[in-house]
A protein has these predicted regions:
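Terminal-region recognition feature
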Residues: 1-229
Length: 229
């Protein structure tokens, strides 16, 4: 009995005769490496290759501050460069820009605004306001490609004057006030350029109220967006 058990164990552990020699002579397995073509990188735009998912969506779901604006700037410039690589005659693809923010820095707002205007010389930016679009976020919503700006039915919009919180001696405060006044003028000019507000109407509203709240219908009425989703 013991011999039969040992024999079975040996048969299980040891390979059949001839198999060991064959495995030594067999060539090593090869690894197939597949290159990613330019067509795939461009979502199949340059040929008939199956398109990879073409994600051209960016989003601002935080404060308007330098680190986030740096990320969005890099993304916009990259997506615009991808459009430049398309062959002549191919339709350029837009970028969808979702905005949901309480606002933030006026300087960073203008940094993003200027980049958007530069990119839109070649690539459409479809802005989409959801949730809340307030303070510095309102200009970014309005700055999208005209006719392609959307807003959620339940989105809240809020506009107010440029604010600052620096303190110091009188000369510093005077200097700071002059800078804020210039920034305020630039903000009003940009809003008038990108919305249906007249300068007189916007200045009147800003002087009457600390915060101006608009619902989706009012945002479309005043030209911050073109349609409600």
């Amino acid at each position: 009995m013991m011999r039969k058990i040992i024999g079975k164990i040996i048969n299980i552990v040891l390979p059949p005769k001839g198999q060991e020699q064959a495995s030594k002579e067999a060539p090593p397995p090869t690894t197939e490496v597949k290159a990613v073509s330019l067509e795939q990188l461009l979502g199949g735009a340059l040929g008939d290759a199956p398109a990879e998912p073409d994600l051209r969506v960016i989003g601002l779901y935080s404060s308007v501050e330098d680190e986030k604006i740096a990320e969005l700037t890099q993304a916009l410039l990259y997506l615009n460069e991808m459009n430049r690589l398309l062959p002549e005659g191919k339709e350029k693809k837009p970028v969808e820009f979702y905005i949901n923010t309480y606002g933030g820095s006026a300087d960073d707002m203008f940094a993003m605004y200027d980049v958007m205007k530069q990119v839109m010389e070649e690539t459409e930016i479809h802005t989409i306001g959801v949730g809340k679009v307030m303070s510095a976020g309102t200009l970014l919503l309005a700055a999208g490609t005209k006719g392609k700006r959307k807003i959620g039915r339940n989105c809240r919009v809020m506009i107010h004057n440029v604010a600052a919180g620096n303190f110091g001696n009188l000369p510093n405060l005077t200097n700071e006030l002059e800078a804020i006044q210039r920034l305020q003028e630039d903000y009003i000019s940009a809003m008038v350029e990108n919305t249906k507000f007249t300068r007189k109407k916007l200045e009147k509203l800003l002087n009457e109220k600390v915060n101006i709240y608009l619902d989706a219908d009012e945002a479309v009425k005043y030209g911050l967006a073109d349609e409600i989703m």
